[in-house]
Amino acid sequence: MAGILTKIFGDGNQKQLKRLEKQVDLIEQLEPEMEKLEDIDFKNKTEEFKTRYKNGESLNDLLIEVYALVREASKRVLGMRPFRTQLLGAIALHEGNISEMKTGEGKTLASTMPAYLNALTDEGVHIITVNDYLAERDAKDNGLLFDFLGITVGFNHNGLSKDEKREAYLADITYGTNNEFGFDYLRDNMVLYKEQMVQRPLNFAIIDEVDSILIDEARTPLIISGSAKKSAALYQQADGFVRTLNKENDYTYDEKTKGVQLTEEGINKAENYFSIENLFDLDHVSLTHHINQALKAHVSMHRDTDYMVEEDEVVIIDQFTGRKMKGRRYSDGLHQAIEAKEGLQIQNESMTLASITFQNYFRMYNKLSGMTGTAKTEEEEFRNIYNMDVIAIPTNLPIAREDRADLIYKSMEGKFRAVVENIKERYENGQPVLVGTVAVETSELISKLLKRAGVKHEVLNAKNHFREADIIEHAGQRGSVTIATNMAGRGTDIKLGDGVKELGGLAVIGTERHESRRIDNQLRGRSGRQGDPGISQFFLSMEDELMRRFGSDNLKSMMERLGMDDSQPIESKMVSRAVESAQKRVEGNNFDARKTILSYDDVLREQREIIYKQRFEVIDDNSDLREIIENMIQSSIERVVATHTQDSDEENWNLEAIIEYSNGNLFDPDTIHTDDLKDKEANEITELLMKKVKEKYDAKEQELTPEQFREFEKVILLRTVDSKWMDHIDQMDQLRQGIHLRAYGQNDPLREYQMEGFSMFEEMVANIEDEVAKYIMKAQIRENLQRQEVVKNTQAVSGGEDSGKKKTKKPVVKSNTVKRNDPCPCGSGKKYKNCHGQ
């Protein structure tokens, strides 16, 4: 059916490529002209392009000339002439799309053209990679090219000071990891002084390995957290209790959803163990939560698959890359439950101070593009969520790799035996082999079996990823055998050594299907780069997780009926189709989960944007805060007056409450009396109180210099907004955790979350207004001239292994220097030199 439709309407990808091909022809026509340029002319051309852009020409108008210039510069500086296919990919990137370019097709070089073109606007270009090694390598290599063209390059990484970061962001093109860019955005919105901000407005980003960042890590929020004080004892008690349970009677485990819950017998055991009557009483909410997390830690979280223990710490393993995610912690107490399970010291739960998902961070850029070898399977998601088309760029040379059908064995033991035999045979012939595994423990098991078989090999998994680039670089040499977990080592080419092509190229062996077809395709794609020969094949067993979760029981019983032993595999199209449809189902489920998370995160995104915008107004030196603060005080007064003057009969108005509020929160005692408010309308009461507020405000302003009083206003606003916002994030997180229970009451959880989230936000805004009113009118000015962070020690935590280092925020604090003849800040009225300046 799809084939018929393609014939009638044409293939969308082919149409796009035809359009791009016409532009590539025009670029190629300019090659002779560009070859005539002297080296010195290239920098002059850059200035010429910038002037033309400022004079009204668009980047699209300049594209043909610009790409021809960069191509010529690349020939001279790097000794590489971009192929036509790289030009196709480069145009697609400029248009804000995803270029699907296979491994070894030169994505890095293709990215230099749109990066240079968009840098001409002087608004900055960010090139984002999955790790610091790749970012630094590309910044250094491509930096030579950009320097030749008169364009500056920055490398943004974890170890930089604020000033160095600011410098990196001020460069025309900035390289760095997704984590670092996201954290800088959050940290910029926690600074106390505008001068401490490092990022410019987000203009254009090119994301390398875009599927890894926008799909695999889309559900991973970037979090800046501070520690919350909670007792470790309850985790240990819950852990002790869970150890007494047996899986036959006390709990159920759903392997598909990884959900664990107590049975009726388990609940009775819990009530007896903790000497309580009803586990589900409101008084025991915390206990129930701790028991659930302990259950999850013991039943669904597996050591060396989901996490590993290193230096007495629980380190999460990324399920997609197999890398260690140092510094990242499971939320909601699960990490502490695993620490209790492993007998480690339980660390404090953290309180979220600021967070954002990659989905929402990258959607803030004016234009976004990306490149990867595997994106077509997630085309719908890229289009729906990021408004990006996936354009599959043809390879420069035809793919010569042979992708063989899957071999399915009855048991894991039989599968691994066959894998080792296959590797040994190839090893003895000198053919290099890359073995892909899904879990760390599988890579270690195969390593053990290969040692026994006398096969020399390298292992690349979460435990030794620091040697990643080195191991991958040598994986194509004669006689080399490399075991890699989940295609760690993306971004580094496997080049074939001498004589390897004659042996059939690199052999890729998959030991298990991943739940995502894309990850399987990435593994296959390591072989057969740039027209090289190669083979790929997956060895599966009926005991593999994907086969267990979605495979057919009929198949296993058929193998048994036929009397097939472990040495006889099935090579069946039917099984391969069943595996693929299982993968499609999982991908669909994961897409739905990411869409749901985005819908929930959008609620917080809107609120975050409002707060961050207001916060920027506070730290921006040009803003008039008095007007903002007076509006806040007026809102606070109007709320109080409205609450106590609702009755249509004025006799029933509670004027005493208004007086108590006014004298307690705004003025000195006995400032407002009943006679002041009697016989006045509600709006007249508000007007009277606001008149008094302005009088007191004027008087307070006289106590200090205008600069010092503006600083006092900023101190109060920042402290109030930050503390209330952080509490609000925490409350929204708790609301999010429990909202799914509303589905039992036939309510849409998302709709409920939106409504409750909105009312909680309004309540937070009211609390901010009330507190600002109180502090501005009642606080002692001299004690409030130093801006302070609400939480001292903060830590940036995310799904990437590069962000694990603790970062203690040390703001550059401006000192408010008081001149000798200024009024003393203590409020005495004397000159500083005659008071505290002696």
From Swiss-Prot:
Cite the cofactor comment: May bind 1 zinc ion per subunit.
- Cite the binding residues for ATP: 86, 104-108, 493
* Zinc keyword on record: yes
What protein am I looking at? Protein translocase subunit SecA
Its chief place of residence is membrane
GO molecular function list: ATP binding; metal ion binding; protein-exporting ATPase activity
For this chain, the family text in UniProt reads: Belongs to the SecA family.
Q: Which domain of life is it from?
A: Bacteria
Under Enzyme Commission nomenclature, its number is: 7.4.2.8
What keywords tag this UniProt record?
Answer: ATP-binding, Cell membrane, Cytoplasm, Membrane, Metal-binding, Nucleotide-binding, Protein transport, Translocase, Translocation, Transport, Zinc
What PROSITE patterns would the database entry show?
Answer: SECA, SECA_MOTOR_DEAD
Task: Tell me the residue numbers annotated for binding Zn(2+).
Answer: 824, 826, 835-836
The compartments listed are:
Cell membrane; Cytoplasm
Enzyme class comes to translocase
Q: Which GO BP terms, alphabetically?
A: intracellular protein transmembrane transport; protein import; protein targeting; protein transport by the Sec complex
Q: Where is this region: Disordered?
A: 793-838
* Reactions that this protein is recorded to catalyse: ATP + H2O + cellular proteinSide 1 = ADP + phosphate + cellular proteinSide 2
Which cofactor(s) are needed, names only?
Answer: Zn(2+)
Q: Which residues form a coiled coil?
A: none
Describe its function. Part of the Sec protein translocase complex. Interacts with the SecYEG preprotein conducting channel. Has a central role in coupling the hydrolysis of ATP to the transfer of proteins into and across the cell membrane, serving as an ATP-driven molecular motor driving the stepwise translocation of polypeptide chains across the membrane.
- HAMAP family recorded: SecA
Q: Which Gene3D superfamilies is this protein grouped with?
A: Helical scaffold and wing domains of SecA (1.10.3060.10), P-loop containing nucleotide triphosphate hydrolases (3.40.50.300), SecA, preprotein cross-linking domain (3.90.1440.10)
